[in-house]
Design a protein with these regions (language model features):
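Transmembrane helical core of 7TM receptor-like proteins
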Residues: 1-315
Length: 315
């Protein structure tokens, strides 16, 4: 069972304990999470398809939304299936390299989501504060650069977090008190002095969360000033309504992420952290199509047209 791998670990694999402490409730959790998983993936994929097929939605706002749906879908696909398998079959083993790979992709997609949300905030800033110049400023070349930078930055930060964690030794235990290879529970298994790695994870997390959140805050500060200058109450309400869904997703996304990653290792709690992780992993990706998209009239119209076209095709 043991092996030496460049002094990085003493174990061949890790074992997820997942929700083993919930006992007989695991079957109920499996049904609940399976339902949420199917709804999340289906709704996000459907949003991507609708935006792709409807020419009225070929704008920067919906381009960014479709990439956010894509990123959320990839994040969900990388975590939830193994979690569901663990609920049915009990403790699931994962190799050292498999754990590192899962951490890299989950961290990369999570970071990418943060950067995409900041890009979407910038898009709302241009749309409200400079509407006459929106088309020229948010041109296809700039949109492609913003999306590409978001994904590249996400991958780089994900790689950095993974390298910081897996340079450590894991000799004391190989049981992960979690349902996937997230940085806090894996870091808690490391033996020896982990203060430098904790500091590295904290710095990387702060760079992702604070920088992207700062950009969103600056964008909305300008948006708020522009909205307050609108003379009519109805005009202010309409302007704010275009940002309300994005703000809802931002608050929940950054609230959960900050609680999960901006704390010292000593403050980790199994039950509490699993609840927050489930909210971040399962519920947050579901908010994208429900809160941000399905409340949007243009998306609602596109969905109706898609269903109408599907029914006519069957007829």
């Amino acid at each position: 069972m043991r092996m030496v791998q460049n002094n990085a670990t003493c174990w061949r694999d890790f074992v997820f304990l997942g929700f083993s402490s919930f006992g007989e409730l695991q079957l109920l959790l499996f049904v609940l999470f399976l339902f949420l998983y199917l709804v999340t993936v289906t709704s996000n994929v459907f949003i991507i398809i609708v935006i792709r097929l409807d020419s009225h939605l070929h704008t920067p706002m919906y381009l960014f939304l479709s990439f956010l749906s894509f990123s959320e879908t990839c994040y969900t696909l990388g975590i939830i299936p193994r979690m569901l398998s663990g609920l049915v079959m009990g403790g699931q083993a994962i190799s050292f390299m498999g754990c590192a790979t899962q951490m890299f992709f989950s961290a990369s997609w999570a970071c990418t989501n943060c950067f995409l949300l900041s890009v979407m905030g910038f898009d709302r800033y241009v749309a409200i504060c400079a509407p006459l110049h929106y088309a020229s400023r948010m041109n296809p070349a700039l949109c492609a650069q913003l999306v590409g930078t978001s994904f590249l930055s996400g991958y780089l930060f994900g790689l950095g977090m993974t390298l910081v964690i897996f340079r450590l030794s894991f000799c004391s235990s190989h049981e992960i008190q979690h349902f996937f290879c997230d940085t806090p529970p894996v870091l808690s298994l490391a033996c020896g002095d982990t203060r430098l790695s904790e500091l590295g994870i904290l710095i990387l997390s702060l760079m992702v969360l604070l920088v992207s959140f700062f950009l969103i805050t600056v964008s909305y500060a300008y948006i708020l000033v522009a909205i307050l200058r609108i003379p009519s109450a109805e005009g202010r309400r309409k302007a704010f309504s275009t940002c309300a869904s994005h703000l809802t997703v931002v608050v929940i996304h950054y609230g959960c992420a900050s609680f999960m990653y901006l704390r010292p290792k000593a403050s980790y709690s199994l039950e509490r952290d699993q609840l927050i992780a489930v909210t971040y992993t399962v519920a947050t990706p579901l908010l994208n199509p429900i809160v941000y998209s399905l409340r949007n009239r243009a998306v609602q119209s596109a969905l109706r047209n898609a269903f109408r076209g599907s029914l006519l095709g069957k007829g």
